[in-house]
């Protein structure tokens, strides 16, 4: 005779919970990325910390390591992050500024060093004068007596014959012409003073130079009215 198996009733454990019952699913809170929700969550977190100050952990205690119990020595706590300086933030002074400040300090403490330092004076270079031989001077004088000015080919030919440079020949002719003109001018003035009718003993006065009389004598035929205006007259008139 067949027995029908009776269905077993589920065993209920203490607390009214069945072992075959599915474990309760924990509701997971979804994270909202809205600005209002983010600000509200942040305000709630700050409010919770501020409401229980006595239960808030000390960050310095958490960060500080515990002393070594075996050796009895503790490790010094590190500096807070706010006190640390990165190499990039450390102000470094340029080396050139340091040298400049050191130089200024030396000058302030020793002002007499600059005055006692020897000053090198650069003397102007003297222009060397060309020394002509007696034969060269005779040939130059002979050429100058015939021709006061030389062209470029003539100057080059004369310099080659006398073993001189063209610049030396050119400068010698320039100086020779200047001396000739000055000598001629002084001779003309001497002749004019000798032949002048105003060359009387009364004219030999320091207040009336002879050069002014010569200029008056030469300009009188052209400007006779100057003597009628009374602006100037010799001392013997």
Swiss-Prot record:
Subcellular location: Nucleus
Summary of the knockout phenotype: Defects in prostate ductal morphogenesis and secretory protein production. The bulbourethral gland displays prostatic epithelial hyperplasia, which increases in severity with age. Mice also display morphogenetic defects of minor salivary glands, which are reduced in size and exhibit severely altered duct morphology.
Cellular-component GO terms for this entry: cytosol; nucleoplasm; nucleus; site of DNA damage
Ranges of the DNA-binding region feature: 125-184
Entry's Gene Ontology BP terms: androgen receptor signaling pathway; branching involved in prostate gland morphogenesis; branching morphogenesis of an epithelial tube; cellular response to hypoxia; cellular response to interleukin-1; cellular response to steroid hormone stimulus; cellular response to tumor necrosis factor; cellular response to xenobiotic stimulus
Record GO terms (molecular function): cysteine-type endopeptidase activator activity involved in apoptotic process; DNA binding; DNA-binding transcription factor activity; DNA-binding transcription factor activity, RNA polymerase II-specific; DNA-binding transcription factor binding; histone deacetylase binding; MADS box domain binding; nuclear estrogen receptor binding
Induction data: By androgens. During embryonic development, induced and maintained by sonic hedgehog in pre-somitic mesoderm, in immature somites and in urogenital sinus, but not in the other expression domains.
Keyword Zinc part of the UniProt annotation: no
CDD domains, per the entry: homeodomain (cd00086)
Compositional bias of kind Polar residues: 24-34
Region (Disordered): 1-96, 108-130
InterPro entries for this protein: HD (IPR001356), HD_metazoa (IPR020479), Homeobox_CS (IPR017970), Homeobox_NK-like (IPR050394), Homeodomain-like_sf (IPR009057)
Biased composition annotated in UniProt, kind: Basic and acidic residues: 1-14, 38-47, 57-71
PTM section of the record: Ubiquitinated by TOPORS; monoubiquitinated at several residues and also polyubiquitinated on single residues.
Protein role: Transcription factor, which binds preferentially the consensus sequence 5'-TAAGT[AG]-3' and can behave as a transcriptional repressor. Plays an important role in normal prostate development, regulating proliferation of glandular epithelium and in the formation of ducts in prostate. Acts as a tumor suppressor controlling prostate carcinogenesis, as shown by the ability to suppress growth and tumorigenicity of prostate carcinoma cells. Plays a role in the formation of minor salivary glands (particularly palatine and lingual glands).
Family note: Belongs to the NK-3 homeobox family.
Protein name stated in the entry: Homeobox protein Nkx-3.1
């Amino acid at each position: 005779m067949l027995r029908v198996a009776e269905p077993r009733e589920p065993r209920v454990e203490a607390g009214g919970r069945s072992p075959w019952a599915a474990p309760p699913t924990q509701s997971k809170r979804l994270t909202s990325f809205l600005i209002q929700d983010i600000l509200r969550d942040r305000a709630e977190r700050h409010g919770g910390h501020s409401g229980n100050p006595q239960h808030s952990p000390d960050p310095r205690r958490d960060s500080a390591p515990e002393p070594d119990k075996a050796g009895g020595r503790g490790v010094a706590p590190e500096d807070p992050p706010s006190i640390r300086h990165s190499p990039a933030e450390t102000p470094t002074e340029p080396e050139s500024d340091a040298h400049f400040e050191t130089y200024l300090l030396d000058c302030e403490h020793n002002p007499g060093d600059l005055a006692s330092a020897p000053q090198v004076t650069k003397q102007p270079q003297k222009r060397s004068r060309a020394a002509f031989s007696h034969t060269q001077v005779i040939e130059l004088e002979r050429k100058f007596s015939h021709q006061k000015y030389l062209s470029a080919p003539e100057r080059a030919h004369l310099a080659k014959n006398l073993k001189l440079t063209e610049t030396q020949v050119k400068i010698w002719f320039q100086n020779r012409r200047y001396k000739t003109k000055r000598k001629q001018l002084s001779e003309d003035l001497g002749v004019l003073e000798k032949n002048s009718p105003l060359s009387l003993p009364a004219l030999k006065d320091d207040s009336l130079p002879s050069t002014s009389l010569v200029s008056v004598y030469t300009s009188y035929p052209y400007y006779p009215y100057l003597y009628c205006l009374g602006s100037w007259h010799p001392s013997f008139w």
